């Protein structure tokens, strides 16, 4: 009797031990298609790691950034794996809020990751996030509509040429809009696109003494061009459209042209989700007076907050989701063209290049993007479509709201730029610039 009770107790404790050993990781990510695919394929990870369970929190881009910023700044500890970009990796890594991505397995082959991507996610040589995909920006256009109109897209178009094409191809009565661009307010939404437009017109966020330049001729020309072109030749409600909204519009055949992230290449050519999959052309992002900073550099990456109590398990998952093995899994289940792009040299095999008609332009754009030299003028900051200082998140969000207001006609462009100049100057002084 005593022996049976003892065995029963031992069995219960063993069962309890197994239950306790299973760790649940809370993964916060953005509602982009590549991440939705990662969530779906993560069942493979859980099968290989029965001691790790995944709890997914999938959010719209602006909401994700707000949630993660609040949680990590307060050391809230809600999440074990964060989907962040180069901006957060640099700043949060420097503050000691992220666990270093050291001691990765040899099979991870970190040397295979593009140096510019590694550097963008590192601080003083220490890597703080593993890149899931990396992107630049490029131009997508409807080859059939260009042919019908007798137009030819140059390999390196100017924004002025883009506006001319948009005017000729804009047929709102047929729900065919000349150009689709980001209008949704957010430092990583409309301001990513707007800043590359401004760079192309020769503008910069700050001069060498950290003084904003929004009322200067370059920003004035760029802002007027952006608001005028998108208001005249864009879809209705453009101020509500970010990356995902414009992707849906393009895939439904409603955009003659679209300038946005290179990562969209696999989606616009996917017949299962794009009505125009066989009618898409690809070329470089537009320039104007300069090509410096005309195409951005960005990476969505997986990081681990120091507040996580399950760092080892979190690193195991992050390494799996950003590995060559994961890329091979995607190629097997969804086709080689859908492999997360922009992070690894090995991705760009002959097979991938043949299957992905957008890959050549995307790869060249990634390699040419230089965050250390984003403007024709000298700048005190690093970043093409953003400024890598802690204050930029708040400033960029506020500026984005004002650009969206100008786009909806709530205020003239000059008035908007004056307001932006004043608010940005005030915030920079409050933060103690110049430093």
Residue map of PLM features:
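Short, well-ordered beta-strand elements
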Residues: 22-32, 52-57, 80-81, 128, ...
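Extracytoplasmic "Venus flytrap"
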Residues: 24-41, 59-61, 135, 385-391
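Extracytoplasmic "Venus flytrap"/periplasmic binding protein-like
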Residues: 40-116, 120-122, 148-150, 157, ...
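Conserved C-terminal helix/tail region of periplasmic/extracytoplasmic solute-binding proteins
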Residues: 53, 147, 371-435
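Hinge/lid segment of periplasmic solute-binding proteins
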Residues: 85-136, 160-161, 178, 190-193, ...
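Extracytoplasmic/periplasmic solute-binding protein
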Residues: 124-132, 137, 161-212, 219, ...
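Glycine-centered hinge/linker elements that transmit conformational signals in sensory
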Residues: 165-168, 209-240, 281-286
